[in-house]
Each structure stands twice: as structure tokens, then as C-alpha cells.
Amino acid sequence: QAAGLMIAAINAVMASLGICDRTIHCKNEGPALCGIEMIKYFKENHYDENILIVGYQPSIISNLTANMKNVRVLDLNPDNIGYEKCGAIIEDGERAMKGAVEWADVILCTGSTVCNGTLVDYLDTGKKTYFFGTTLAGTAKLLDLDRLCFADIV
């Protein structure tokens, strides 16, 4: 909980200073529209590549699995691991991480990795890595991470 409060404070201060943007989560049809924008981006930039999604975000997963050739998904939630959801078998984010990263050409990580401490696992993989969502807004700016967030579009 303390990490979440710190991340929220960083985002609020940095947004109020105009240093980062898109710090408010999408509502209503926003997540579905985000998934559509994400697939447009990946079709244009990473069509034939192996895509590893880190974190369970249904709209993004369902859009990428339906439109891209090779997608794997990692998550830490035991309620998701081992089940097929949104067109993908959700793999254990701890046990399958090393092999999944080796397999991937590109990695798409939830911004929640900054809260649960797994962000560091994806910083120096040697793979093109994007972080998505609003949670990571301030941290992405501070660490100069590639961030995909379509909140301003949706």
C-alpha cells in the first residue's frame, strides 16, 4: 500500500508541474478503446514479432491475441494463472518470466509493475520494452521509459 501511495503522490506532483501527463485511469468505454489503439500501434510497429504482455489487462490482451501472431501473457494473480482468458493462457509471472522474456521480441508491461516491484525485472532485458497505463506516468518520465498510454485519445 505504501508503494501505491508513493506512486500516486509522484504522479500527482509531476502532473501538477506539467512534467507528465495521462495520470487518470480510463473509464467507461476507455479501456476498450485503448485496446483498439494498442492493436493499431502493434500492427504498425511490431506485426511479425513475438509479444510478451506482462499483467492482466483484458482489452489489451484480447485485441493483441486476436490480431497478432504470437502473444504470451504473464501475471502474478493466482486467480488468473493457468487459465485461458481473452484468448491466451495466462502464465505464472514468476516461474515463466525468464523463458518468456527470452522468447519475446517485444515486451508490453503494465504500469503496475512499479507498484509490485517487478518493474526492475523488465528494465535491462535487451528487448524492446514498453510500459502501459497511467500508474507509471511519473516513473516513466523519471526513468525515461517507453510508455504507451492512449488515455488522451480515448
Language model feature labels by segment:
Residues 1-58, 63:
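Electropositive, gly/pro-rich neighborhoods at or near active sites that engage anionic ligands
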Residues 50, 105-106:
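Structural motif
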Residues 50, 69-72, 128:
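Residues at the starts of beta-strands that form the adenosine-phosphate
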Residues 54-56, 74-76, 93, 109-112, ...:
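Short His-Asn-centered micro-motif
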Residues 56-91:
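Histidine/lysine/aspartate-rich catalytic loop segments that bind and position anionic ligands
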Residues 64-67, 101-102, 121-127:
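Short, conserved loop/helix-junction motifs that constitute active-site signature segments
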Residues 90-102:
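Short acidic low-complexity segments
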Residues 118-154:
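C-terminal functional extensions of proteins
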